[in-house]
Amino acid sequence: MTRLVLGSASSGRLKVLQQAGVDPLVVVSGVDEDAIMAGLGPAATPADVVRVLARAKAEQVATTLTGQQASVATDCLVIGCDSMLYIDGRLCGKPETVDDARQLWRSMAGRCGHLYTGHSVVRLTEQRVTHRDDETSTTTVHFATPSDDDLEAYLATGESLKVAGGFTLDGLGGWFITGVEGDPSAVVGIGLPLTRDLISRAGISIAALWASNPLP
């Protein structure tokens, strides 16, 4: 029985997994993303950045679990993810202010950007790491051009400050997405096809995850 552990506070990622029939334990990593990115240097590619961040989150949660006196389960699979939008030669995470989100949306309007999502898994067996793996998915997102009134109304909801790139596909921001090339679930924050591959390489089937992590 493998317990799935999601190393993320993202409600979007949790929702994707639950809609796919799995109810994971949520353990937030709390890693210092800015410090990790600063340590990567300018040569790091967008795919490298999100993969390293995802790995750091999964590793931090795995360390937390191995340090507990009472283990969550004999067998655990920790998943860490990180998403960032690449547009105009720069990586964009969560906007820090409404003004930042407004400028980002004005630069995205009527154009497309590339959403990079890093995925990392760490398997723990009897509190020992027995498997590590990570990979990045890339999805192209096409944006509409919202009117000034619509954009201001969207910014006023606060949703844009909670997500990478300042937009959602599965929320209010979905009104302003005209198309997606690639995996839609990766845009929400965790790509099911890539996650399935990583889980399989860890020696675990989706059927086994359904059985050991049932929805309430």
Curated annotation (Swiss-Prot):
Name the enzyme's class: hydrolase
Swiss-Prot/TrEMBL GO biological process terms: nucleotide metabolic process
Q: Which cofactor does it need?
A: a divalent metal cation
Lineage summary = Bacteria, Bacillati, Actinomycetota, Actinomycetes, Mycobacteriales
Which Pfam families does the record cross-reference, listed alphabetically?
Maf
- Family, as annotated: Belongs to the Maf family.
Annotated organism of origin: Mycobacterium marinum (strain ATCC BAA-535 / M)
PANTHER family linked to this entry: BIFUNCTIONAL DTTP/UTP PYROPHOSPHATASE/METHYLTRANSFERASE PROTEIN-RELATED, BIFUNCTIONAL DTTP_UTP PYROPHOSPHATASE_METHYLTRANSFERASE PROTEIN-RELATED
User: Which E.C. number(s) belong to this protein?
Assistant: 3.6.1.9
- Keyword terms of this UniProt record: Cytoplasm, Hydrolase, Nucleotide metabolism
* Name of this chain's protein: Nucleoside triphosphate pyrophosphatase
Q: Can you say where in the cell this protein is located?
A: Cytoplasm
Write down the Gene3D superfamilies for this protein, in alphabetical order: 3.90.950.10
SUPFAM superfamilies assigned: ITPase-like
Task: Show the CDD domains listed in the entry.
Answer: Maf
**Which reaction is catalysed here?**
a ribonucleoside 5'-triphosphate + H2O = a ribonucleoside 5'-phosphate + diphosphate + H(+); a 2'-deoxyribonucleoside 5'-triphosphate + H2O = a 2'-deoxyribonucleoside 5'-phosphate + diphosphate + H(+)
InterPro entries in the record, alphabetically? Answer: ITPase-like_fam, Maf-like
What function is annotated for this protein?
Nucleoside triphosphate pyrophosphatase. May have a dual role in cell division arrest and in preventing the incorporation of modified nucleotides into cellular nucleic acids.
